[in-house]
Regions:
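Nucleic acid-binding interface residues in structured DNA/RNA-binding domains
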Residues: 1-109
Length: 109
C-alpha cells in the first residue's frame, strides 16, 4: 500500500520538475520515510512507467554514484526534459516541484 502511495505521488511530478525523496514521502503521507521512497522506486513495475528520474536527494543531487550508468541515465532523462544538471546536481530553487492545493486535495491512494 505504501509503495502505491509513493508511485502515485511520483507520477504527479511534471516534466521539467523534480522533487526530493523526503518531499515525496511527505506528500504521500509518509513523513520521515525518504528511504522507503528509494526502495519503492526501485521495486516499481516497469509497466507503470514511474518517472523515477525526477526524484533527487534533498540538495538536488543525483543519488546514484557519479559515473555510474544509472547516474548517466538519470542525468540524460532530466536534461531531455529541460532540467539543468551540473556536477550531478540540480538547482532545486529553480526546478523543484511544488504542487498546488487542488493537486494535493485530489490525490488518490
Amino acid at each position: 500500500m505504501n509503495h502505491h502511495r509513493i508511485w502515485q505521488t511520483v507520477l504527479l511530478i511534471p516534466q521539467g520538475r523534480v522533487a526530493g525523496y523526503g518531499q515525496v514521502a511527505d506528500l504521500a503521507g509518509l513523513p520521515g520515510r525518504a528511504r522507503m521512497v528509494g526502495k519503492a522506486l526501485g521495486e516499481a513495475p516497469a509497466e507503470l512507467e514511474i518517472p523515477w528520474h525526477r526524484v533527487l536527494r534533498s540538495g538536488g543531487q543525483i543519488a546514484f554514484p557519479a559515473g555510474s550508468d544509472k547516474a548517466a541515465q538519470q542525468k540524460g532523462r532530466l536534461q531531455e526534459e529541460g532540467v539543468a544538471v551540473l556536477n550531478n546536481r540540480v538547482k532545486m530553487a529553480e526546478f523543484q516541484w511544488w504542487p498546488d492545493l487542488a493537486t494535493l486535495l485530489l490525490m488518490e491512494y
